[in-house]
């Protein structure tokens, strides 16, 4: 999320993320999200590998949101979910190699998400939690029409 109107780039604002070069490395970036600080970078040899790369952060957002959404639902239902673990991988594949894709030209971004649920859950509960994972807000954003507006300030 970014804002473009003056006065709305307050780093303490919960709905604003600011990314700025650190100039301590080739591509190292300081990320400020509310009161939280993160570092992003490109892996060596392109960058200095000082932090996760942008796709790692994208996958982390989806994985965290998925796990949190499942946890909230299971807790609300008082189901015996002990642990959620989400493993994600990003790849770019040829569109022609994607059987379920509408696009047949160029490349498709593909995210493989595996969810491990630990606890004494029955099959119906596990199936329901798999459906709930699809309702994670980050998943909804990634699978909806997204528009990014960019401006120079």
Outline where the language-model segments fall.
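Extended beta-strand/beta-hairpin segments
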Residues: 1-60, 71-153
